[in-house]
């Protein structure tokens, strides 16, 4: 699929400078922006209108999930796809103002033999102008339409906040929805039906992305021993990372993909080891009687966090990649696990045992920790690529589902239905345009 910006020569009255929103969503005094995502005007093949409606629906869902927007009911729209204009001069701003809409997104889609040309534009209702910085054209196949919607949502959020959104991303997780044992699944950010990636017929845990987003790690007990495997996203074949019968409980690629951190069990003692990308040991980083697991890299590649029982109960520690500079960074109670380092390096999220199990977000040095969940069972946080959101596994009414929240914990959205005990989420890196 190609990403092409709309030429300014095509535009009428426009506004290009964004009114950037500062601070976190749902902060004091914040208001969700009423937005209308109109089904696209379709031409060409018979499925064009349906694809145009799907684009609009996905875009609306993405923007509502962000917490910045409130999508309006399409039944209130005063313009219809087959008759609406696509410029500011042909947009009925008076009618749109009556619906309460502040922004309107509309456009056109042409489908010929499965090939799609799509144009989407955003209009500011109070100013009665088109927002030039947001208009986009896309070319691709019918199957690319969801990604076109995600990229449009990314562009709108970047216009609003100054930072690209997380919408054109994916989430790995483990689930039993395909049978009695868990496998690795993946779905797009908006919760489209998950796609099964593995068929292990064994216990599977701890999926983690390669920084390219093209492959992933996971731990399988297929040989009755936890071992680390890697698999390309488009493949059905996984290969072992470390040769021989070596027990590895979890692993994580470095930000540049050149190294791996793994929790390796040797003689009943689990420590953190540094490997090269081919699985060759480079260095043992921890050497303690306590259990050291769940390594997560800092974005700069010079530090990592992990969970250790060295103090007598699980806590989160940070260490330099050369094995020095050990310091504890978890201070919420006596039981803290599953660290996840934020993409910007300024925060670490982890699970704490408090009124069940809750998610904590703290500074990378452990200061300023706050709960982003309050009750129930909530575990295994993973950061969105923009660092504004997290996904975690939660127990809801006897089901295990994946839930998204902002980093302040002011909103929560369920992303899966819990059909198969959904756990161990891992949010992907950004996908390149």
Model-based region annotation:
Residues 21, 86-155:
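Amphipathic beta-strand/beta-sheet edge segments enriched in Tyr/Trp
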Residues 26-91, 105, 109-111:
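Short beta-strand->alpha-helix linker/helix-N-cap micro-motif
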Residues 126, 188-192, 232-236, 276-280, ...:
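Short loop/turn segments that connect beta-strands within beta-propeller blades
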Residues 154, 164-189, 194:
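An edge-strand/N-cap motif at the start of beta-rich repeat modules
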Residues 164, 175-183, 199-202, 219-228, ...:
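A flexible loop/linker signature enriched in serine peptidases of the S9 family
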Residues 165-167, 211-212, 255-256, 299-300, ...:
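Residue-level detector of Asp-centered blade-edge/turn motifs that repeat once per structural unit
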Residues 171, 216, 257-261, 301-305, ...:
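Hydrophobic beta-strand positions that form the internal "hydrophobic ladder"
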